Amino acid sequence: TRSDRDWSSDVCSSDLLHDIDYDKFDIGHGDSLTGPLHWDDEPFEAIVSNPPYSIRWDGDANPLMINDPRFSPAGVLAPKSKADLAFIMHSLSWLATSGTAAIVCFPGVLYRGGAEKKIRKYLIDNNFIDCIIQLPDNLFFGTSIATCIMVLKKSKAENSTFFIDASKECIKVTNSNKLTQKNMDTIIDAYKNRANDDHVSILVPNSDIAEQDYNLSVSTYVEQKDTREIIDITVLNAEIEKIVVREQILRNEINKIISEIEVYA
């Protein structure tokens, strides 16, 4: 089910050109939040979603939404001005118990407060978030924002969330960034291995995330590599001493010149 935007169905329809049999598609053009299609087909084992970022939706202006089984478990609705977490709750609701969902997200959903923090709390406390992957900026057409991928699962082995910083996994192409196959393989390998790797990835207990006020920003947990040049203080002090000595020599020469000028004057 796609959001009620022409480009969504156009992108979906274009996939028919990628050598995939048309009988494997069931394309629906509707509103995923207020009028979803494919009710008879859910739950799904695999869900991939790139919903529009921070669009408006009915939210609590529609009294039916808070009782909708897709949204009601969180006890609160996503803000009317930012539907991001409504799309996430929709995907979670339609996900099979053994399935996996991957949703491209606007970064604000990871740290904004209010109702969105309450929804994150629901997702973390119920152990539904498997992984957060920070992507490079300038990756998608129409926005330079560094987006992220939220991976959802309903049957996880550990009560933890995996964080991957893939913000540097790209190549520059004109004014945009692009993921090469090597970049994608690196990200996938990190996700599969679920190993702590300095400046790249870390597995964080959900209790620690709760202590961080349910902030899911990757930078909160994966420390950025310090690329600043290491300065040798001894060498720096020696250079400063040379400058001070040179400055004094110049001052003496200037004073000598001034004295000679005064004599001739």
Q: Where do the model's predicted regions map?
A:
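S-adenosyl-L-methionine
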Residues: 14-42
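A conserved structural/catalytic subdomain of Rossmann-like adenosyl-cofactor enzymes
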Residues: 32-265
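Generic structural signal for beta-strand residues in well-ordered domains
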Residues: 5-6, 20, 94
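Single conserved hydrophobic/aromatic residue that forms the stacking wall/gate
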Residues: 1-12
